[in-house]
Every structure is written in structure tokens, then in C-alpha cells.
Amino acid sequence: ELVDKKSGVSARLTIAAYENAVSAAERRAIMNNEKTTQVWLSDLTGIIPSITGKIELVYEGEQEGPYQVAYNLLERAIRTQFIQYFPNPDSLKKKKGKEQVTENPYKSISKWFDGGNNLNIFLDIKDEDKIRLLYHVDGLHALVKKYFNSGTEKEDALLMEFVLHGLAAHSLISK
């Protein structure tokens, strides 16, 4: 609703976004002297310039600002994709006058954060350090293994990061 639908979005946006995501990962690898890396969800902040440079906003979007609109689009995409791979957190929330039927698979993760724990993962952190930090969150690895039991350590870690971003997008934890 903040993007001018009449202006259209060219295929160049997708290409530029892909290149910027890969570039963010390569930059991080070079800074940390790593031979290999992967694109993490946190690298997707690198695509924001691709979005702001390729979309036209309506008046309300201009008022909010191109950066914020791009960030919100990214957040909405994570929210939409999250429920394709993991249970929808919105369906687990208690409705007025109704009992919660399904066990909340995110309970131990939320409880870990509610207990005063936090996770500070900076954009330029080494892959091995990021993986180590992700494993500190109670229940996070178990949740990923429950739904994707055949991943490698790096694939699991990427999914663990995805879960955290997804839960934040669904307001179960704070960023």
C-alpha cells in the first residue's frame, strides 16, 4: 500500500537484491578472513538499497521513508515465508474464551528470552561464532531438527536464524 503499483518493479530489482545479498556475505567473509561462507538472513539487510533504488512510493510511503518501507517489505516477506516451513505462531495464540488446543513449539525459545537472556549477533560476525551463539538459545536447535532433521550444521544454523527472525516478525520475541 506504500509502493506505487502503477510504476511496476523491474526484474533488475531481483538481480540487484541477489547481488547485494551475496556481496554482504562476501564482505563479511573477507573481513573475517574466512575462506567460505553462506548468505545469512541478517545479510538480507544488504538488499535494502536495491529495494529503495528500484521502487517508487506513493505519498504515504514517502512520508514513512524509503528505508523503512523496504525494511517493512523484508519483514513481511520473512513473516510470509516463515509459516510455509514452521507452524503459524498466530494460530497458537489464545483466542478470547477459547483454550489453546495445540502445544506451542516456540514456548522454550520464548521462555529463554523472557528469562532475561538476549542474543547479540552483529552483522559482521564470523560464521562459527554466529553458529555457536545460536546454539545457546534453549529449544531452538530442537525445533529446527523437529521440522528439518537432515540438515548440516550450517543449514541448521541458517534455519535457527530464520526461526528467530520469524518469531520476531510475529511479535513473539523482540529484535
Which residue stretches match the model-derived regions?
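C-terminal helical "lid" of AAA+/P-loop NTPase domains
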Residues: 12-30
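C-terminal engagement/docking regions of AAA+ P-loop ATPases
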Residues: 6, 26-175
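An accessory alpha-helical subdomain
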Residues: 4-13
